[in-house]
Amino acid sequence: MDFQQLADVADKWCSNTPFDLIATEETERRMDFYADPGVSFYVLCPESGCGDHFHVWSESEDCLPFLQLAQDYISSCGKKTLHEILEKVFKSFRPLLGLPDVDDDTFEEYNADVEEEEPEADHQQMGVSQQ
């Protein structure tokens, strides 16, 4: 995919997130993204036909630790699309953006299941107190 097509994918992705595509540099194949409050990162795109992977990084030391999930995802086996990588970055930055974690729903469902099992837990406590 040529760089302009990748930039179009990134621009479309931005329309559904708090991020803006603030700069593109075709010679470096670099795209810079920014969202309030000061969350920024950039993506280096591989050359067309090259076996290289995408690369994500941030020049902000506050943002950098949050990119670990996306960096691990990129380095895992298999070819990734720009959209998949941007989605991972968005998920990584949700806490910095003040958005709920995507996995919170799963956790709440798990807690709901645990609450249903409370009578069983009471029974175990009774068994312990009898000893």
Curated annotation (Swiss-Prot):
Keywords associated with the record? Cell cycle, Cytoplasm, Developmental protein, Differentiation, Growth arrest
What's any one GO cellular component for it? cytoplasm
Keyword Cytoplasm tagged: yes
Question: Chief localization class?
Answer: cytoplasm
Instruction: Region Disordered: list its residue ranges.
Output: 107-131
> Which Pfam family is an annotated match for this chain, by its short name?
DUF4581
Where does it localize? Cytoplasm
Choose any GO biological process term that the UniProt entry carries and state it: regulation of cell cycle
The source's domain of life comes to Eukaryota
Effect of gene knockout: Morpholino knockdown of the protein causes an accumulation of neuronal progenitor cells resulting in the neural plate expansion.
Q: Bias regions of kind Acidic residues — which residues?
A: 107-120
Checking InterPro entries in the record gives: Maturin
Q: What induces it?
A: Up-regulated by the proneural transcription factors Neurog2, Neurod1 and Ebf3.
Family, similarity comment = Belongs to the MTURN family.
Per the entry, what this protein does is: Involved in early neuronal development; required for cell cycle exit and differentiation of primary neurons. Cooperates synergistically with pak3 to promote primary neural differentiation within the neural plate. May play a role in promoting megakaryocyte differentiation.
The molecule here is called: Maturin
What is the originating organism of this protein?
Answer: Xenopus laevis (African clawed frog)
